[in-house]
Amino acid sequence: ETWSYNMVPPIVPGFSFNQVRSSSRVGLHPQLVDYNLLKSDGAHVGLNDDSTVAPGASITYLWYAGDIVPNKKGTRIVGIPHEFGAIALEDMGDVIKHASHGAIGALVIEPQCSRWDEGAGSKAQVEITYWKPEAVLSRHGKHLKRKICPAAEPNLDSGKLYRFKEMVLLYQDNLSVQQYGQPVPNLRNGDDSEDSGQKGFNYRTEPLWARLGASAADEPETMSQFDWSNVLSSTVPHFRCEADFVNKKYCDPETPIFTAKAGEPVRFRVVHPGGHPRQHGFTLFGHDWVPSPWVDASKTMGWNQDGLTRVGSAGGIGPGRDVNILTTAGGDCKVSGDYLYRTQEGFMFGGGLWGIFRVDENPGLRWYQPAWAWAGNLFGYETNGVASADVCKVQALNNAPVVQP
């Protein structure tokens, strides 16, 4: 046990985070998937069997990525597969302290007939290639053991393969972190216990106060004395980081730096497995997406033709919540460069909840601007009847890339 500044609401008088001993039992509790509640819930609730596990022991959970329902005659169960995307995995062995010490996770349900290639040095970024299952009459609702994918993978040039880049990002907002052997104090701007603890993404954090050489507990008056103008830049020196642009030594944040080529389809999986009930807003600069990317009666993900709204920020992200963002690297105009992703709460952003989405140039794409597209068009002025989507166009100089539908 280590002492922490992390706090919880005062459930009983004198109750605090540091007065609770961590449980030695752990479990994996999923959402959305179907399973036997008595054996694979990953929790110990009421009169149900305990499906958590003690130190030195193991347990196997069986989950189905979809709905399990009886057939019309009630003679057997049938499975209806669902592409859920990202799902939070919670440790229900100790809902108070385990997430604070890193016991979190996510389950990603990919499209049917998928394979994935992990990026170098990170399992949070992969390239997904998938092809649609064989067109079998009444495929949905068949027996669970029925084979649904083709026997062989289609050729790359067959037009039947689809590909996207996937980035998984886990919120952590109740971390018990130490510096120089001492617990890091809470951010001075926090409002109550829901804001306590340190912040991070994927076991990484990059507090702005640390980049400035300040302390988490410094008063706002003290913080206002620092020069914030280049605090997000990777090309200028920061506290304990000497950037050298000529020799390509950069002061990048410790939080995940996701990469993709301009024009490449990408899916951000943003998950908050467990922590404080303070909700977050996630923003990806320079990009937008449809809030509900569901098609095929909400069984798969894709371009939702009925989704008329496009947003650049997703709110209401609390414990157990997930957001699936389907967009294009570099935005509609497929522009390369570094794009900021961050949480929208100001002091939590300063506490480390931000990072970089690095979009590299794509030699297979060429951007051009039509002659009519002057600056006024970009700000909603008269477009002479030309659709705003034509402000930028991209032409392929080589074979068209494999994309998602």
Which positions does each model-derived feature cover?
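Copper-binding active sites and cupredoxin-like electron-transfer domains
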Residues: 1-405
